[in-house]
Amino acid sequence: LLELKVIADVGLVGFPNVGKSTFLSRVTNAQPKIANYHFTTLSPNLGVVDTENGGFVIADIPGLIEGASEGVGLGHEFLRHIERTRVIIHIVDAASTEGRDPIDDIYKINKELEAYNPEIASRPQVIAANKIDCIFTEDGEESPIDKLKKEFEPKGIQVYAISAVSGQGVRELLFHVKELLDNCKQEPIVFEQEFFPEDMLMSENLPYTVE
């Protein structure tokens, strides 16, 4: 089996149900399955983004969970898809609609990326702080967007407040992603031969012992 090493320019990563499929359907003509259930996406959905400065291919990577680098929740399959992209869009639920901390989520996902392959964690990232239409803050309370910017922009990771449902903030995010791609080293597309040890064992005349 010959396998395409690079499947997309950009990979969407994040925990399940943060809006990756909705984002993909917003920015491309792709029609991924969208539902309010974890693991709705079980294989990458690809779409083409067109901007004034050119287009790029984007892949909705199935939602990651803690332990993915150890194979939990089909983790190795999911991480292998991310390995084949050049820029990462990290989508988080900025409104914490499921009670999750978006800052904590980003660190957890990046920890899984680094554990699987440190080179992936070093690739250009941008944070899409999604579901801003669902954010409600008390008077004097710091907004989750400001918290994300304060945490990650000093590290060189830009944060864009977006709504995948309404499209707010999406255009600016896409232009930044295109700039990141333009500044990336273009890696050649490589075909690899898949290796399955069990096939090798079956094809060889190995000695056996009956006890």
Regions found by a protein language model. Name each.
Residues L46, I82, I106, L113, ...:
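Short amphipathic alpha-helical/adjacent loop interface patches that line ligand
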Residues V72-L74, Y107-K108, S143-D146:
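Charged helix-capping and loop-helix junction motifs
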Residues G73, D104, Q168:
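Conserved active-site and cofactor/substrate-binding residues in soluble primary-metabolism enzymes
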